[in-house]
Amino acid sequence: MQQNLLDDRISIRLGQIRADTEFVISEASALFLNATLGFPALLYTNLPDGGTVYPMGTLGIRLAFTPVEEFTFQTAIFEGNKFAQNVNRHGFRYSLNPEFGYLWINEAQLRWSQNENSSGLAGTFRVGAWVHTARFSNPFDGELLDGNYGFYFIVDQILYRQDGAEESGKGLNWFGRLGSRRRIRTLSAFTSIPA
């Protein structure tokens, strides 16, 4: 369920939600079929059962605030464990048990040259952070540690577009992603800077 308020400046979404449809998204990388450029390993390898990503979401609530056209801040909290697909075969096994933790993710987006009156090339900068409240096993010594967290940055920029090609979306785009997580807690950090 989604409700938009104040001329769509505030958006509230509640229900079975996937984080990979709302957060840590690069528009330019979405053109590729390769899963490497989708939801980053930084999150899905560091969250229980891959986190709240395709093909199953979890119970969650997302709030987005867009005070001006160029800026959006969004925050969401999700059930912390969607359970493995061999346990949660139909995607409707919910548990709000604090033992499984909760995933809280925040993202700020700054956009430029996005409307039809803009003369420059469009771009977007995103910065985000996430926290998972469950206990995690340290992969190096097996010790149980409270919580896990990380951050990320994403840049999308159109570098070249022929006159009149705005509607087709054709042109030369660049994107870069950089992120990290709490050291020694989990297995991966990521950098992705294709040209």
Each predicted region: which residue ranges?
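Residues on the lipid-exposed face of transmembrane beta-strands in outer-membrane beta-barrel proteins
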Residues: M1-Q3, I61-F65, N106-L110, F153-Q157, ...
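Gram-negative outer-membrane beta-barrel proteins
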Residues: D7, D20-V24, N81-Q85, Q114-E116, ...
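Extracellular loop and loop/strand-boundary signature of outer-membrane beta-barrel proteins
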Residues: N46-D49, R89-N97, F140-G142, S180-I184
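Short loop/turn motifs that connect adjacent beta-strands in outer-membrane beta-barrel proteins
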Residues: L6-R9, E70, S113-T124, Y160-L172
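Loop-centered beta-sheet repeat module
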Residues: V68-F136
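Outer membrane beta-barrel
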Residues: M1-K82, T186-F190
